[in-house]
UniProtKB/Swiss-Prot annotation:
The keyword Transferase does not apply. This is WD repeat, SAM and U-box domain-containing protein 1. One of its GO terms (biological process) is protein ubiquitination. SUPFAM superfamilies: RING/U-box, SAM/Pointed domain, WD40 repeat-like. Pfam families: SAM_2, U-box, WD40. It comes from Homo sapiens (Human). The lineage of its organism: Eukaryota, Metazoa, Chordata, Craniata, Vertebrata. The keyword Ribosomal protein does not apply. GO terms for molecular function: ubiquitin-protein transferase activity. Residues 332-396 form the SAM domain. WD repeats lie at residues 10-47, 52-91, 95-134, 137-176, 178-228, 237-276, 279-318. Residues 403-476 form the U-box domain. The modification Phosphothreonine is found at residue 458.
Length: 476
């Protein structure tokens, strides 16, 4: 459903932020640099890294066109860069000289907001590079900032836990205590929840904080009816402070990264967990979806940025409810089964399956014996392949029926893992199951069929922690 396709390890210190444009990925770090990569092959651009800041770079963001990149730093500056050649366009100094923690472009590229450690927030004219408006929150440092998709207002989050809403004239529209121990990040979904009368639009806003929670809010604003912020729900998948959150471009997914070293991907419609990713070895500090592809970037204090790719077809299946998925599979017609066989690169079996009237229900009940004896499939390799694919289909039905994320299920036992370990093939398994697998002199990987380089099993504590957290929130 989601796979790690690339790891960037060029920074010399903690990765603080990552951001996508339509063609580039930008990352910034405690090492004072910003790096730019092409999305074609994830190679670093010739004019990267970008160097100017004298202290840690906390945040970076692209203008909507992708031609300009903004970066901000502990040195009290926000810098604009030309992404095509790396040329520095402007250096904008925070009026107070305070460390700048966050920066964000408005949707129309006319303004750039910067928030600082002393609680000041500045709106800059992104064309003239001059200060347009300045304000400040009552208490705490600025840690988060997000513009509404229509650009009529923006939200800031503070270390005191307050969400503050500002209009484009820097007038405070609303302030609300959102997270007890401080806000770390916030993001708007670019897709409206619905359109109402009188031009009223509703948007989802996600916020996360030191209280280990991700909260969803519904926001509306018109000049006639004013502003309204309504709390909707809390996502409690993490067991440590949540440092980052971001919506996918289509608004269908929400991702969060945490001090517990995990990344969680949620379905925004059902709020179910789709994936828990546990590859980072230290705090996950940032996460971002690409605007036009099914790519996700996650950055960490382990100095790396991981690039993940989603499978659209499988992802759509994962969003089905238990009844819908079961009904969908069991109600497959013979033609549906033929289509599935072709998709699995098993088109040679279409004729045999049609001749034997194999529909969805019969497909799920096929066994090793029935493939050989009843369907007369002579090739052992072909029988093994189709059986593997059917088992994958059964597993999806079973895991999604129970609501268990795929990453929590042992590939050998097909059950929820209690004591996950990482084998030398890089996959996680239930400890007892993998020990039994190896003790029977099966020195090949259950997942790849390649020879295991080593019999060493390493406890996957991060995954175990994520499973325990999931169990706590799903026990009835």
């Amino acid at each position: 459903m989601v796979k790690l396709i690339h790891t960037l390890a060029d920074h010399g210190d903690d990765v603080n932020c990552c951001a996508f444009s339509f063609s580039l990925l930008a990352t910034c770090s405690l090492d004072k640099t910003i790096r730019l990569y092409s999305l074609r092959d994830f190679t670093e651009l010739p004019h990267s890294p970008l160097k100017f800041h004298t202290y840690a770079v906390h945040c970076c963001c692209f203008s909507p066109s992708g031609h300009i990149l903004a970066s901000c730093s502990t040195d009290g500056t926000t810098v604009l860069w030309n992404t095509e050649n790396g040329q520095m366009l402007a250096v904008m100094e925070q009026p107070s000289g305070s460390p700048v923690r966050v920066c964000q472009f408005s949707p129309d590229s006319t303004c750039l907001a910067s928030g600082a450690a002393d609680g000041t927030v500045v709106l800059w004219n992104a064309q003239s590079y001059k200060l347009y408006r300045c304000g400040s929150v009552k208490d705490g440092s600025l840690a988060a900032c997000a513009f509404s998709p229509n650009g009529s207002f923006f939200v800031t989050g503070s270390s005191c836990g307050d969400l503050t809403v500002w209009d484009d004239k820097m007038r405070c529209l609303h302030s609300e205590k959102a997270h007890d121990l401080g806000i770390t990040c916030c993001d708007f979904s670019s897709q409206p929840v619905s359109d109402g009368e009188q031009g009223l639009q509703f948007f989802r806003l996600a916020s996360c904080g030191q209280d280990c929670q991700v909260k969803i809010w519904i926001v509306s604003f018109t000049h006639i009816l004013g502003f309204e912020l309504k709390y909707k729900s809390t996502l409690s998948g993490h067991c440590a402070p949540v440092l980052a959150c971001a919506f996918s471009h289509d608004g269908q997914m929400l991702v969060s990264g945490s001090v517990d070293k995990s990344v969680i991907v949620y379905d925004t419609n059902t709020e179910n967990i789709l994936h828990t990713l546990t590859q980072h070895t230290r705090y996950v500090t940032t996460c971002a979806f690409a605007p036009n592809t099914l790519l996700l970037a996650t950055g960490s204090m382990d100095k790396t940025v991981n690039i993940w790719q989603f499978d659209l077809e499988t992802l759509c299946q994962a969003r089905r409810t238990e009844h819908q998925l079961k009904q969908f599979t069991e109600d497959w017609s013979e033609e549906d089964v033929s289509t599935w066989l072709c998709a699995q690169d098993l088109k040679d079996l279409v004729g045999i399956f049609k001749m034997n009237n194999i529909d969805g229900k019969e497909l799920l009940n096929l066994t090793k014996e029935s493939l050989a004896d009843d369907l007369k499939i002579e090739s052992l390799g072909l029988r093994s392949k189709v059986l593997r694919k059917i088992e994958e289909l059964r597993t999806k039905v079973k895991s999604l029926s129970s609501g268990i994320p795929d990453e929590f299920i042992c590939p050998i036992t097909r059950e929820l893992m209690k004591d996950p370990v990482i084998a030398s093939d890089g996959y996680s398994y239930e400890k007892e199951a993998m020990e039994n697998w190896i003790s029977k002199k099966k020195r090949t990987s259950p997942m790849t069929n390649l020879v295991l380089p080593s019999a060493v099993l390493t406890p996957n504590r991060t995954l175990k922690m994520a499973i325990n957290r999931w169990l706590e929130t799903h026990q009835k």
